[in-house]
Curated annotation (Swiss-Prot):
Domain of life: Eukaryota
GO biological process: mRNA transport; protein transport
GO cellular component: nuclear membrane; nuclear pore
UniProt domain RRM Nup35-type: residue ranges: 183-264
Species assigned in the record: Arabidopsis thaliana
GO MF term set: nucleic acid binding; structural constituent of nuclear pore
Pfam families reported in the protein's UniProt record: RRM_Nup35 (PF05172)
Protein's name in the database: Nuclear pore complex protein NUP35
Matching Gene3D superfamilies: 3.30.70.330
Keywords assigned: mRNA transport, Nuclear pore complex, Nucleus, Protein transport, Translocation, Transport
Chain spans, region Disordered: 48-105, 123-167, 271-315
Biased composition (Polar residues): 123-139, 282-306
Length: 329
């Protein structure tokens, strides 16, 4: 019976289902473009694998596929004890036999055994540093477990630690301090750093600090002298003049008298005595012919010496008369 007998007068063409089943497979959709190629492939398959059963399709579960996930380092919550006990990287886990219900069937498959052998060779042939780094990373992940996500990223040894701030060296002015005590007691100070010709100039400057009871010059051509003030407050004022410039030409230093020198000066003051500052009087002319006394010159007290070079004569006033009687000018 011809195909025209099956057609009805209402429909002049075949149904869509019949057309789909009757249409040949195109070369783009099919695996083989011609029946000859399909026959050759089937003959080759029967020749190689004709004596064995066809391998079953691979069976995978969600637990098995988790090993291939790029997030295999993250702890999963599967109920399978085998999957939790063996946590490896995707590269290593792919080289081992996959644990599935159809394990025996998979091992019997020659294609899967060949694939496992190739992958094991790739893993064994990898460089030693790669395997060591993999092993180190896996052990670190096992040790850390579920720690902080930043662990291993920030290393404490790589942090730059700043040194402690150093104290700024500031020069401090060394101030001469007199031992504390009664401020009304007498106090010795030593003035130094001037030439013998500037003795009067220095002495007049330090008389501005307070009442000077006595002064003791040093040996011949010495650049220092001892000054005794009436109280300690005046001696403190004299110590503050250390490093001061007098008349723009002389810079002097001041320091307290050493305890040993202070004791020797007090003993000489009590035993022999020094010439006190005489009060001003009208008998200055009668006192001038007398030899000028020298105080403790080279250890000898009151050694008379003739007056040397000319001294600068101050103005004729009460202060000048006072200094004339004091120094014998």
């Amino acid at each position: 019976m011809s195909a025209a007998a099956h057609r009805t007068p209402k429909s002049g063409r075949q149904s869509l289902l019949f057309q789909d089943l009757a249409s040949p497979v195109s070369a783009r959709r099919g695996k083989f473009s011609s029946p000859g190629q399909a026959a050759a492939v089937s003959a080759l398959w029967r020749e190689n694998f004709g004596g064995s059963d066809l391998p079953p399709p691979p069976m995978y579960t969600l637990d098995d596929r988790s090993d291939f996930s790029p997030e295999s380092g993250i702890a999963d919550y599967s109920a399978s004890p085998d999957a939790k006990s063996d946590r490896r990287t995707p590269f290593q886990s792919s080289g081992k036999n996959i644990v599935t219900p159809g394990k025996g069937k998979l091992e019997a498959s020659p294609s899967f055994s060949l694939l496992n052998a190739q992958q094991s060779q790739q893993v064994s042939g990898s460089p030693s540093w790669w395997s060591q780094s993999k092993a180190g990373s896996s052990t670190e992940q096992d040790d850390k477990g579920k720690g902080s996500p930043v662990e291993g990223v920030v290393q404490p040894g790589a942090l730059v630690t700043l040194p402690p701030p150093r104290e700024v060296a500031r020069p401090e002015v060394q101030r001469q301090i007199i031992p504390t005590g009664n401020l009304d007691e007498e106090e010795w100070v030593t003035v130094y750093g001037f030439s013998p010709g500037d003795t009067n100039l220095v002495l007049r400057e330090f008389e501005k600090c307070g009442m000077v009871l006595k002064h003791v010059p040093g040996p011949r051509n010495a650049n220092w002298m001892h000054i005794l003030y009436q109280n300690r407050s005046d001696a403190h004022k004299a110590l503050n003049k250390a490093g001061m410039m007098i008349n723009g030409v002389v810079i002097v230093g001041v320091k307290p008298v050493d305890p040993i020198q202070k004791q020797a000066l007090n003993e000489r003051l009590n035993n022999q005595g020094f010439m006190p500052l005489p009060p001003p009087s009208s008998t200055r002319n009668t006192a001038r012919p007398l030899s000028r006394p020298q105080y403790l010159q080279n250890g000898s007290a009151f050694s008379p010496q003739p007056s040397g070079g000319a001294m600068a004569s101050p103005s004729k006033s009460m202060v000048s008369k006072f200094f004339d009687l004091m120094f014998g000018v």
